[in-house]
Amino acid sequence: MSEKKEGDKIPRHGVPKGSRTKNQELLYDVNVATSTHAEQARTLTEKMSTATLCTISERSDGCPYGSFVTYAIHDGHPIFLISILAEHTKNLEAESRASLMVSESGEGNPLALGRVTLLGKCEKLSKDDDPSLKEVYLRRHPNASFYVDFEDFSFYKLKISEARYIGGFGRMSWVGGSDWENSEPDPLFESAGDIISHMNEDHEDAMVIICKEMSKAKDTASATMTGIDRYGFEMSAMTAEGPRPIRIGFENEATDSEEARKEIVALVKKARGDI
């Protein structure tokens, strides 16, 4: 991963979702711990399973050719199960360079959602040489069991050389191949949705207290959790100036939902003055 200064837990992150203008003063500690763009991009690709594969068209004089594909992550890189009859497969046989665009699904402004474009070269893989390919892919796409053993279907892996990550407005950067290789998906990504729903449905009062006592949003009237990761969580705090983004860091990294619960409880107690 990128070199860090001594004492820096992780690099400063971009502005969380919810800020109306980039000129507004941030109402939280700008040095709060958060995941890197490499980690966020890895997490996004693990969460999703469909994407747009762009190959170089052999038929149309090198024009980019976009195809809808399903994928799974194998050893940190996406694999596809595609037929030799498909146009994108013919393109890859002639030119291995390709890109894969993975987009986050969700409500609201689609441009505020995350997406990442992975660039690299595709390599044809042997089903017989590595049985784990089939296992990993079918775990993600069980319906593919019908055709996974057909002779005209093969696995291809996109070996990522770099990636362009956009996490929404104000969050974007290039992620190098080595940073991609050395990062990991966030361990909370599978449980994040349930944690967020639970906090918003049952513990808004606790989040309001945290905003008032642990950020500059002293006039917070309501708060909604918008994201959570191993390092902390983000909220949209309703203030007199409208919704404002707030990020609060955990004292310790949370590797599962139970650890995240304990960290949130500790923050609530601290905000209330119980500790």
Where are these regions (language model features)?
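Binding-site signature for planar aromatic cofactors or substrates
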Residues: 1-275
